[in-house]
């Protein structure tokens, strides 16, 4: 066995921890990368500019989730072929994925740029920040192919058991983004446009470096392969499409939720946007653990080591409990200070109240998110996508129904009050599907 195969040889808790930790750190730096715009714009331009950037978040998340969902399909197949040592098929999937998704990202970029104003208007973006939001969004869409390709390549790195290179690239691009943000926003006075341009440049550099490093990484696996294969594309889409639908539909749902928040005014939106950034920091810890479980499961499925899949799932749940307690303690102790990091002196009492109330409520229930993400990660790794999709749609339906029906009548707090209930019901559905899969182990081996 080579050192690349530790996910199918080392003790599951050890292997998953070693594999997941760089991904968790990477998620942290990903959010530093994302939050740099918000913090720097909020402090050096003002809360209205922060609200303008925050107003774009729900929409940009839709497009990011398309990239993440596409990466899931490629990642599951790459992991499985890597685990079974079918390196030719693995490289064919890599090449087919990159070519197909490059075309898709270019089409989405053109669409997003062309309809930025229409989409922001449809979200009921406050009129005083509409033009600034559209400007930020259009610059974002120019760089979208870079972001798309980086996310695909990052998933492929983790699929072959390599989580340290994506971490290194994220640290580099985060530092570059912060430096460019400060220079363009504070020194050059370019405001929101400067923040968007800084992100575009950092994403471009990161995507190019990722491509070069990944191509070098897979050179060691000598085997013939096809640059494009329709059969592999079909297998890829069978896994990717449900994941794209799940992730993008959830993000569309978040856009609808934001359209409920927007009428409460710019300051309420600023407070909501600040806590959304904080939620993303902590939630991506659990997302990272779930994402680490998927290639662990896929590689062991390819190697026909079903018992290790169960052990890996239990290890993931243990990690989730540890980080849920950590998240609760941080938020309960420092929620006011965290809010001030984004809102600064320009934030009103309303902005601080919205941010603090939302943040503390989430802190009590992050464990629900953790167990949901771990269970979803195992389902993805096994290629069991239908119940995965159904569970996440039910989660979204609970969140939307409460926000749309109760928040306009009883206050903004109902936007986030149903979030934990959605997470918990999602977990129950996913766990039921997973338990059925484990009971039919012979079916797993045949996948």
What name fits each language-model region?
Residues 28, 32-51, 120-127, 183-190, ...:
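Helix-terminus/linker motif at the lipid-water interface of multi-pass membrane proteins
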Residues 1-20, 78-143, 189-241, 297-364, ...:
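Short alpha-helical transmembrane segments in multi-pass integral membrane proteins
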Residues 18, 41-61, 127-132, 192-193, ...:
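Interfacial/gating helices of multi-pass transporter permease domains
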Residues 62-65, 177-181, 206-211, 281-284, ...:
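Hydrophobic transmembrane alpha-helices of multi-pass small-molecule transporters
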Residues 18-37, 139, 150, 173, ...:
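Transmembrane helical elements of multi-pass membrane transporters/channels
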Residues 71, 140-158, 166-174, 195-208, ...:
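Short runs within selected transmembrane alpha-helices of multi-pass transporters and secretion channels
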Residues 50-110, 147-166, 271-335, 369-383, ...:
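Small-residue-rich hydrophobic transmembrane alpha-helices
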Residues 9, 13-32, 36, 59-66, ...:
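Residue-level signal for short hydrophobic patches within transmembrane helices
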């Amino acid at each position: 066995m080579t050192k690349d195969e530790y996910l199918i040889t080392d003790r599951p808790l050890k292997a998953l921890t070693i594999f997941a930790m760089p991904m968790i750190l990477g998620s942290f730096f990903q959010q530093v990368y994302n939050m740099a715009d918000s913090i720097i714009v909020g402090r050096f331009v003002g809360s209205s500019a922060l609200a303008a950037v925050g107003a774009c978040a729900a929409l940009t998340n839709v497009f990011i989730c398309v990239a993440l969902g596409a990466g899931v399909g490629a990642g599951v197949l790459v992991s499985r072929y890597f685990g079974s040592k079918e390196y030719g098929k693995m490289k064919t999937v890599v090449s087919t994925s990159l070519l197909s998704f490059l075309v898709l990202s270019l089409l989405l970029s053109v669409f997003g740029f062309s309809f930025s104003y229409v989409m922001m208007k449809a979200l009921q973006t406050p009129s005083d920040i509409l033009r600034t939001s559209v400007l930020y969004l259009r610059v974002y869409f120019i760089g979208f192919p870079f972001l798309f390709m980086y996310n695909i390549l990052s998933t492929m790195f983790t699929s072959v058991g390599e989580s340290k290179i994506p971490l290194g690239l994220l640290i580099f691009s985060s530092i570059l983004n912060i430096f460019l943000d400060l220079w363009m926003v504070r020194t050059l006075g370019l405001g929101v446009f400067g923040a968007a341009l800084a992100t575009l440049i950092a994403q471009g550099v990161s995507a190019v470096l990722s491509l070069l490093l990944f191509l070098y990484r897979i050179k060691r696996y000598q085997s013939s392969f096809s640059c494009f294969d329709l059969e592999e594309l079909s297998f890829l889409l069978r896994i990717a499409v449900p994941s794209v639908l799940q992730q993008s539909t959830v993000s569309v749902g978040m856009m609808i939720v934001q359209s409920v928040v927007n009428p409460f005014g710019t300051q309420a939106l600023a407070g909501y946007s600040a806590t959304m950034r904080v939620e993303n920091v902590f939630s991506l810890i659990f997302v990272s653990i779930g994402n680490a479980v998927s290639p662990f499961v896929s590689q062991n499925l390819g190697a026909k080591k079903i018992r290790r899949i169960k052990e890996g799932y239990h290890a993931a749940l243990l990690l989730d409990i540890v980080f849920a307690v950590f998240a609760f303690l941080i938020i309960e102790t420092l929620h006011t200070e965290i809010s001030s990091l984004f809102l600064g002196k320009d934030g009103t009492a309303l902005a601080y109240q919205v941010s603090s109330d939302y943040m503390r409520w989430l802190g009590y229930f992050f464990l629900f998110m953790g167990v949901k993400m771990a269970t979803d990660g195992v389902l993805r790794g096994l290629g069991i996508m239908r119940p995965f999709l159904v569970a996440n749609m039910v989660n979204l339906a609970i969140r939307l129904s409460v926000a749309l029906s109760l928040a306009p009548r009883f206050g903004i707090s109902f936007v986030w009050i149903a979030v934990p209930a959605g997470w918990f019901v999602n977990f129950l559905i996913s766990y039921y599907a997973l338990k059925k899969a484990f009971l039919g182990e012979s079916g797993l081996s045949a996948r």
